[in-house]
Every structure is written in structure tokens, then in C-alpha cells.
Design a protein with these regions (language model features):
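Flexible, glycine-rich beta-alpha linker
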Residues: 52-69
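Active-site "gating" loop of Rossmann-like NAD(P)-dependent oxidoreductase/epimerase domains
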Residues: 5-29
Length: 147
């Protein structure tokens, strides 16, 4: 099953461990709690099922207007509205890497059945946006926004 790191509450220590508390995440809401319910339902039926919990997935065929939004802001020389001080950490995982891992799980019947997957190092929102703007040789002008 492809689940999500949205099963972890926003206040949990990062990086999340597979045995970390799963609970409502105020940013993800029912998406995360529905993933928890799906995981539980699967494990009730198939106790040795595999569950992969990726963070933000990026790459070809991405239908989420996330990376493209930041690139569009950079192209248009728009300032970027940064939540808080931009220190919140994000973690990404390329769709090709997810496919490689899924293939390995299927072929090798790995011993670990629940896995958080993603790039080893998280990145702050501010650093991520800065890297995206740098793809266009630009430096973002940030506007800090509080909740």
C-alpha cells in the first residue's frame, strides 16, 4: 500500500520513525486520518502487508501544482509568500525512486513491512524555494506570512 507521511501529526519529532505516533495532522486533515484508517483496515486483513509512507512525491506526471507553482512564481519574478520564517522542513521523494523501491519490495520480500521513504535530508521551505528560483538564476523576495 502506498500511504503517506501525512499519517504523522505536525508536532511530531522529525524525521518520523515508523513507530511514531500516527494522529491527525492539522495541515493534512482527513487526508492523513483516512490514510491511517486505510492502513489499519489493510493490516486487519493482511497482517504482513507492506506499507510505504512517502513524503512529497515529485517527478514526471505529477498532478499536484506544488513545484510548478514555485517555478511559475520564479519565472514571473513574483515574491514568494513564506509561511512563518520558512523554517518548516519538507521531505521529497522522486517517483522513479518510489517505483524502484516498490519493485524491490515485490521481488525481494523485504523483512521490514512498514517503511517511511524519502530523501535522507529534509529541506526547509525557504531553502527549497531558493533552490527552485535558482533554476532560473533568480533570488526570491520573501514575504513572511503568519498564521
Amino acid at each position: 500500500m502506498i500511504s503517506s507521511s501525512a499519517v504523522y501529526p505536525e508536532y511530531g519529532d522529525q524525521p518520523f520513525r515508523e513507530d511514531s505516533e500516527r494522529a491527525l495532522n492539522r495541515y493534512w486533515g482527513s487526508y492523513g486520518t483516512d490514510k491511517i484508517a486505510a492502513e489499519d483496515a489493510l493490516l486487519d486483513r493482511v497482517s504482513d502487508a507492506y506499507i510505504l509512507r512517502p513524503p512529497y512525491i515529485y517527478g514526471p506526471m505529477n498532478n499536484v501544482y506544488r513545484e510548478a507553482f514555485v517555478f511559475d512564481c520564479a519565472r514571473a519574478d513574483r515574491p514568494f509568500y513564506l509561511p512563518g520564517d520558512g523554517g518548516m522542513k519538507l521531505q521529497f521523494f522522486h517517483v522513479k525512486d518510489l517505483c524502484i523501491l516498490m519493485e524491490r519490495v515485490i521481488e525481494e520480500k523485504l523483512e521490514t513491512h512498514i517503511m517511511n521513504v524519502g530523501n535522507v535530508e529534509p529541506v526547509t521551505i525557504k531553502d527549497w524555494v531558493t533552490m527552485c528560483y535558482a533554476c532560473f538564476d533568480k533570488i526570491p523576495a520573501f514575504v513572511n506570512v503568519s498564521e
